Amino acid sequence: MSIASVASVFNGDHAVGSQVTVRGWVRTRRDSKAGISFLALYDGSCFDPIQGVIPNNLPNYDDEVLKLTAGCSLVMTGDVVESPGAGQAFELQVTAVEVTGWVDDPDTYPMAAKRHSIEHLRELAHLRPRTNIIGAVARVRNCLSQAIHRFYHEQGFIWVSTPLITASDCEGAGEMFRVSTLDMENLPRTDAGKVDYDKDFFGKESFLTVSGQLNAETYACALSKVYTFGPTFRAENSNTTRHLAEFWMVEPEVAFATLDDAAKLAEDMLKYAFNAVLNERMDDLSFFNERVDKTVIERLQAFVSSDFAQVDYTDAVEILKNCGKKFEFAVEWGIDLQSEHERYLAEEHFKAPVVVKNYPKDIKAFYMRLNDDGKTVAAMDVLAPGIGEIIGGAQREERLDVLDARLAEMELSQEDYWWYRDLRRYGTVPHAGFGLGFERLVSYVTGVNNIRDVIPFPRAPRSASF
């Protein structure tokens, strides 16, 4: 007897006639008049449950098997046989069932075998992994994560753990969560009446990071090719399907790289990750294609076979102004492109993923390299058909005098970024990178359009349960 995952049985890893033990939870049970019960058991290793055919001569058939309901956990042993029914190649002729956990009250079990709205499932985040849709999201999320790590490993990158607590605001937007151990009921004050952060744990104002980029740059300027993959935080009071207060970012940084190098890296990474999902998780993709978005598989296949288009921001604005389409947000040079503009470019004009580059400096961060025209910076956004922006990146400003001028323009303190400026003082080097919002990627791949449904425990305004 061997312990087997449901996926390994379906993959044919166990010969027909061999005895295996599977462990998991009941999806459904139905009983025939012939004295046989059919049990669907899932263990999360793949989308489909395995069917166990249970005869009524088992010693615990009447007392336990006939009382099994959705959610009960058990260990099931049986012989692998070819399934006569459609839908799966193998099933188990069960020889033993051991119940390990009962559902206290099947009538009130929230995950009983009925379809729930995805909004309702959000209120049951501790139980929703048991549903088909959230289980499938979890497997696809894992597949994408593993593929991204594998891609960078194969490309010779070094993974860097950047800090979650920081004193720097990477985006300069100020939308940061403060980290403090001060007594909120009795805050220490300076003579000027301001909060005295010198009395705080770190001796200064500290925050949860909005990006690992600045820290990653320090390692790229020593190790050449690095990336960070971890949680980031934004105190942005946005209740939309596209925003979270806590989300994961993939951020590579490459020394001696240009903006075009970063664009090529982004294209290669996305295609690698999408191919991995198409090759490894077609069972889950088929579910999403059938139940969530009928274009999921076609969209991914088209993406990996497309050449990325490239367009300057200035030219993109002209395309949008002259396309004859009425947008909710007016288009003029100097605006930040809205989702409707991005999707028009990717879906209707180029009909392919597109890299928009060289944005106006006034709408971009201080660290982006100033172009020779003095008006634009070497920044890019990767736009994908079906979602819009999926990656944002830039060549970094490696010239200290220009960086200092940008800090002054944006009224940011040189003192706060002393260590970042040091990189430009000691062996400065051109370098570039980008940020990929991981949940945005999972949403794109699965077709699940609310970003709160592609992360296990979403954190958003007035939402921090579990």
Swiss-Prot record:
InterPro entries xrefs: Aa-tRNA-synt_II, aa-tRNA-synth_II, aa-tRNA-synth_II/BPL/LPL, Asn-tRNA-ligase, Asp/Asn-tRNA-synth_IIb, NA-bd_OB-fold, NA-bd_OB_tRNA
Alphabetized HAMAP family for the sequence: Asn_tRNA_synth
CDD domains named in the record: AsxRS_core (cd00776), EcAsnRS_like_N (cd04318)
Enzyme's top EC category: ligase
Signal peptide interval: none
GO annotation, biological process: asparaginyl-tRNA aminoacylation
One cellular-component annotation, GO: cytoplasm
Subunit record text: Homodimer.
Cell compartments where the protein resides: Cytoplasm
Similarity comment text for this entry: Belongs to the class-II aminoacyl-tRNA synthetase family.
Molecular function in Gene Ontology: asparagine-tRNA ligase activity; ATP binding; nucleic acid binding
Catalytic activity entry: tRNA(Asn) + L-asparagine + ATP = L-asparaginyl-tRNA(Asn) + AMP + diphosphate + H(+)
Residue intervals passing through the bilayer: none
Name of the protein: Asparagine--tRNA ligase
Documented EC number(s): 6.1.1.22
One Pfam assignment: tRNA_anti-codon
UniProtKB keywords: Aminoacyl-tRNA synthetase, ATP-binding, Cytoplasm, Ligase, Nucleotide-binding, Protein biosynthesis
